[in-house]
C-alpha cells in the first residue's frame, strides 16, 4: 500500500486477532468486510473494516481517499475512525461502533412520531453535512441506510456512516464521477454534468421527504423512467399521505429538491429554515401512516444493505440482559447474535484465514415495490 495518506502511521499487526476478538460479520463491500469486534485490552466494542490488499490492486487511490476523508472528520454525528492497523495481507480500519440500529427500524418501532421528530433528525444530518462541506468533503451517497442511531437510548443521536464514495474537493473544483444510489442522486449527477456539494443537499431533501410519508419521491420499475423523473425533478406531495404535513415542511423540501443546483439550498440555508430553526414543525402523530409506508416500501428483504446494524443491536441487548441469563442459555429474540447473512461471510473475508476476493460486492438493492401503497 502506498503511504501517501495524511495522518498517523499505520500500526503493524501480524494477526489482528491478537488485539481484537472477532464477534460477527456486520457487512461486506467490494473489497472489504466489516466485523463486530472487542478490544481484548479495554473490552470496548468496535467495528473493524478489513481490507485485503490484493483486492486493492489498481484501487489504492480510492482506499486512500476514504482514509484521508475519515482522518479529517471529528463530529458528534459522524462515525469516527479510531485507529489503523496493517498486516502483510490486510489493512484494518478501527471504526467507532454505533449500536442503536437503523433509522427506519427506530421509526417503525416507535408508537409516536411527528414532524418535529423528523425535523430534529434532519437538523443533525444537516449540521454534520455542513461540517463536511466546510472541510471540502462531499459525501455523495447520503441515504437512510447510511443513517444509524448511536445507541439504544430513546433520545440517541443519529450518525452518518459509510464514506466509501466521499470525495475531497479542491478549492473551486467540481466533481464529475457518476456515483451514488439512484433514488437519492441529484439530477445533475444523472445528467453527467459537473457537480458540487449541492448533490448532498438534494439527497437530504429526498431523505426528509421519506421521513414524512414513508415512501420515496421517485419510483418506477423501469430505470430509464425513474431517471427521467429525477432529471425533471418531478415529484408530488400526494394525498392523503401529505394531508397532515405542514406547508413549512413542504417548502423546506422544495428548496432542497430544487432541480437547479445554483438555486438549491445549501446546508447553511437549510439550517436557517423555519421548519428546522423555528417552530413550524407540527406535533401531530403521523406514526401509523409513515410506519406502514416504510414497511411496505423499504422491506428488509429488498434493502440488501451492506451493513448489518441488527447484529449490533442484538449484541448490545444481549449485554444488557446480564451474565446470569447468558449462563443459563436464555438468549431469546433479543439475546442472540445474528449469524452472517447469505450462508456466512463472503468467500475470502478477513474473519477467515484468507483474503477478500476482488469485486465480490453485494448486488445493488432493487427499488421499493411501490412508490405509495394503499
Swiss-Prot record:
<dbReference type="GO" id="GO:0005516">
    <property type="term" value="F:calmodulin binding"/>
</dbReference>
<keyword id="KW-0597">Phosphoprotein</keyword>
<dbReference type="GO" id="GO:0032880">
    <property type="term" value="P:regulation of protein localization"/>
</dbReference>
<keyword id="KW-0963">Cytoplasm</keyword>
<keyword id="KW-0418">Kinase</keyword>
<feature type="region of interest" description="Autoinhibitory domain">
    <location>
        <begin position="276"/>
        <end position="316"/>
    </location>
</feature>
<dbReference type="GO" id="GO:0004683">
    <property type="term" value="F:calcium/calmodulin-dependent protein kinase activity"/>
</dbReference>
<feature type="cross-link" description="Glycyl lysine isopeptide (Lys-Gly) (interchain with G-Cter in ubiquitin)">
    <location>
        <position position="59"/>
    </location>
</feature>
<keyword id="KW-0539">Nucleus</keyword>
<dbReference type="GO" id="GO:0045944">
    <property type="term" value="P:positive regulation of transcription by RNA polymerase II"/>
</dbReference>
<feature type="active site" description="Proton acceptor">
    <location>
        <position position="141"/>
    </location>
</feature>
<keyword id="KW-0524">Neurogenesis</keyword>
<feature type="region of interest" description="Calmodulin-binding">
    <location>
        <begin position="296"/>
        <end position="317"/>
    </location>
</feature>
<keyword id="KW-0832">Ubl conjugation</keyword>
<dbReference type="GO" id="GO:0006913">
    <property type="term" value="P:nucleocytoplasmic transport"/>
</dbReference>
<keyword id="KW-0221">Differentiation</keyword>
<feature type="modified residue" description="Phosphothreonine; by CaMKK1 and CaMKK2">
    <location>
        <position position="177"/>
    </location>
</feature>
<dbReference type="InterPro" id="IPR011009">
    <property type="entry name" value="Kinase-like_dom_sf"/>
</dbReference>
<keyword id="KW-0723">Serine/threonine-protein kinase</keyword>
<keyword id="KW-0547">Nucleotide-binding</keyword>
<dbReference type="GO" id="GO:0106310">
    <property type="term" value="F:protein serine kinase activity"/>
</dbReference>
<keyword id="KW-0217">Developmental protein</keyword>
<dbReference type="GO" id="GO:0007399">
    <property type="term" value="P:nervous system development"/>
</dbReference>
<dbReference type="Pfam" id="PF00069">
    <property type="entry name" value="Pkinase"/>
</dbReference>
<dbReference type="GO" id="GO:0060143">
    <property type="term" value="P:positive regulation of syncytium formation by plasma membrane fusion"/>
</dbReference>
<dbReference type="GO" id="GO:0005634">
    <property type="term" value="C:nucleus"/>
</dbReference>
<dbReference type="GO" id="GO:0010976">
    <property type="term" value="P:positive regulation of neuron projection development"/>
</dbReference>
<dbReference type="GO" id="GO:0051835">
    <property type="term" value="P:positive regulation of synapse structural plasticity"/>
</dbReference>
<dbReference type="GO" id="GO:0005524">
    <property type="term" value="F:ATP binding"/>
</dbReference>
<dbReference type="GO" id="GO:0071902">
    <property type="term" value="P:positive regulation of protein serine/threonine kinase activity"/>
</dbReference>
<comment type="similarity">
    <text>Belongs to the protein kinase superfamily. CAMK Ser/Thr protein kinase family. CaMK subfamily.</text>
</comment>
<feature type="short sequence motif" description="Nuclear export signal">
    <location>
        <begin position="315"/>
        <end position="321"/>
    </location>
</feature>
<dbReference type="InterPro" id="IPR017441">
    <property type="entry name" value="Protein_kinase_ATP_BS"/>
</dbReference>
<comment type="function">
    <text>Calcium/calmodulin-dependent protein kinase that operates in the calcium-triggered CaMKK-CaMK1 signaling cascade and, upon calcium influx, regulates transcription activators activity, cell cycle, hormone production, cell differentiation, actin filament organization and neurite outgrowth. Recognizes the substrate consensus sequence [MVLIF]-x-R-x(2)-[ST]-x(3)-[MVLIF]. Regulates axonal extension and growth cone motility in hippocampal and cerebellar nerve cells.</text>
</comment>
<dbReference type="GO" id="GO:0051149">
    <property type="term" value="P:positive regulation of muscle cell differentiation"/>
</dbReference>
<dbReference type="GO" id="GO:0007165">
    <property type="term" value="P:signal transduction"/>
</dbReference>
<feature type="binding site">
    <location>
        <position position="49"/>
    </location>
    <ligand>
        <name>ATP</name>
    </ligand>
</feature>
<dbReference type="GO" id="GO:0060999">
    <property type="term" value="P:positive regulation of dendritic spine development"/>
</dbReference>
<keyword id="KW-0067">ATP-binding</keyword>
<keyword id="KW-0131">Cell cycle</keyword>
<dbReference type="InterPro" id="IPR008271">
    <property type="entry name" value="Ser/Thr_kinase_AS"/>
</dbReference>
<dbReference type="GO" id="GO:0051147">
    <property type="term" value="P:regulation of muscle cell differentiation"/>
</dbReference>
Amino acid at each position: 500500500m502506498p503511504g501517501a495518506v495524511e495522518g498517523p502511521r499505520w500500526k503493524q499487526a501480524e494477526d489482528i486477532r491478537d488485539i481484537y476478538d472477532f464477534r460477527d460479520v456486520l457487512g461486506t463491500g467490494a473489497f472489504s468486510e466489516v466485523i463486530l469486534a472487542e478490544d481484548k485490552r479495554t473490552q470496548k466494542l468496535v467495528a473493524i473494516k478489513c481490507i485485503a490488499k490484493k483486492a486493492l490492486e489498481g484501487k489504492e487511490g480510492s482506499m486512500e481517499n476514504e482514509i484521508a476523508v475519515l482522518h479529517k472528520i471529528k463530529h458528534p454525528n459522524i462515525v469516527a475512525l479510531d485507529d489503523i492497523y496493517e498486516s502483510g495481507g490486510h489493512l484494518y480500519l478501527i471504526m467507532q461502533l454505533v449500536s442503536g440500529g437503523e433509522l427506519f427500524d427506530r421509526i417503525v418501532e416507535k408508537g409516536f412520531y411527528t414532524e418535529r421528530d423528523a425535523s430534529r433528525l434532519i437538523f443533525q444530518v444537516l449540521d454534520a453535512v455542513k461540517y463536511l462541506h466546510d472541510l471540502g468533503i462531499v459525501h455523495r451517497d447520503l441515504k437512510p441506510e447510511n443513517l444509524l442511531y448511536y445507541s439504544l437510548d430513546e433520545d440517541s443521536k443519529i450518525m452518518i456512516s459509510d464514506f466509501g464514495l466521499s470525495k475531497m474537493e479542491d478549492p473551486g473544483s467540481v466533481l464529475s464521477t457518476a456515483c451514488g444510489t439512484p433514488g437519492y442522486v441529484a439530477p445533475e449527477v444523472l445528467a453527467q454534468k459537473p457537480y458540487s456539494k449541492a448533490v448532498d443537499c438534494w439527497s437530504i431533501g429526498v431523505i426528509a421527504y421519506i421521513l414524512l410519508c414513508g415512501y420515496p419521491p421517485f419510483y418506477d420499475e423501469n430505470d430509464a423512467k425513474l431517471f427521467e423523473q429525477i432529471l425533471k425533478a418531478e415529484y408530488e406531495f400526494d394525498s392523503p399521505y401529505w394531508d397532515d404535513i405542514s406547508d413549512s415542511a413542504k417548502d423546506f423540501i422544495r428548496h432542497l429538491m430544487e432541480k437547479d443546483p445554483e438555486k438549491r439550498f445549501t446546508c447553511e440555508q437549510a439550517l436557517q429554515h423555519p421548519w428546522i430553526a423555528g417552530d413550524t414543525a407540527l406535533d401531530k402523530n403521523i406514526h401509523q401512516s409513515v410506519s406502514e409506508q416504510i414497511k411496505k416500501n423499504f422491506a428488509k428483504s429488498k434493502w440488501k444493505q451492506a451493513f448489518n446494524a441488527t447484529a449490533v443491536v442484538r449484541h448490545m441487548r444481549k449485554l444488557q440482559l446480564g451474565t446470569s441469563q447468558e449462563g443459563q442459555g436464555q438468549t431469546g429474540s433479543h439475546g442472540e447474535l445474528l449469524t452472517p447473512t447469505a450462508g456466512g461471510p463472503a468467500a475470502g473475508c478477513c474473519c477467515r484465514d484468507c483474503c477478500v476476493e476482488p469485486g465480490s460486492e453485494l448486488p445493488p438493492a432493487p427499488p421499493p415495490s411501490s412508490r405509495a401503497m394503499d
